[in-house]
Swiss-Prot record:
It is found in: Cell inner membrane. The chain crosses the membrane at residues 10-30. Keywords: ATP-binding, Cell inner membrane, Cell membrane, Ion transport, Membrane, Nucleotide-binding, Potassium, Potassium transport, Transmembrane, Transmembrane helix, Transport. The lineage of its organism: Bacteria, Pseudomonadati, Pseudomonadota, Gammaproteobacteria, Enterobacterales. The gene is kdpC. It is a single-pass membrane protein. Belongs to the KdpC family. Coiled coil: none annotated. It holds the Pfam family KdpC. This is Potassium-transporting ATPase KdpC subunit.
Length: 190
């Protein structure tokens, strides 16, 4: 019985620290130092939230750049069901899935001459990826230009404007945020 009091006081102390002080402190510091990121990196137009800069969206029309396929359950880019397809590289189902995606992309992009970029046919580990390479975006330019009646040069400049360079040049590659790029396309129509 003599060991119960120190054990109980240690438990209550750690409960207070890990269940109260630490979460409140990290929330306060996050809101202070990184308010935009701590609140979900939401992209707003006036009072309307159009999306998050961190989570992809299911853009399907010919007038939009398409991102990586989503492997989330129930609906594409479902943040409550984040996860990959869990299909191994050796799984024949993955081969069938990729072949179907390549065929669909070829049909939707008949003017694209180069091979289909790999990130347009493979889902990311989270199933929520919002970035593709500038090359994958450029591959889709003929389709988007035709659907929106824009020039190739306009779309090339837009991709360059929304391309983000890696923090360190030799680690990573440039990426384009598909959500921001497509929202910029919509603004061109206004």
């Amino acid at each position: 019985m003599s060991g119960l009091r120190p054990a109980l006081s240690t438990f209550l102390f750690l409960l207070l620290i890990t269940g109260g002080v630490y979460p409140l402190l990290t929330t306060a510091l996050g809101q202070w130092w990184f308010p935009w990121q701590a609140n979900g990196s939401l992209i707003r137009e006036g009072d309307t939230v159009r999306g998050s800069a961190l989570i992809g969206q299911n853009f399907t029309g010919n007038g939009y750049f398409h991102g990586r396929p989503s492997a989330t359950a129930e609906m594409p880019y479902n943040p409550q069901a984040s996860g990959g397809s869990n299909l191994a590289v050796s799984n024949p189902e993955l081969d069938k899935l990729i072949a179907a995606r390549v065929a669909a992309l070829r049909a939707a992009n008949p003017d694209a001459s180069a091979s289909v970029p790999v990130e347009l046919v493979t889902a990311s580990a989270s199933g929520l990826d919002n970035n593709i390479t500038p090359q994958a975006a450029a591959w889709q330019i003929p389709r988007v230009a035709k659907a929106r009646n824009l020039s190739v040069e306009q779309l090339t400049q837009l991709i360059a404007k929304y391309s983000q360079q890696p923090l360190v040049n030799y680690i990573g590659q440039p990426v384009v945020n598909i959500v921001e790029l497509n929202l910029a396309l919509d603004k061109l129509d206004e």
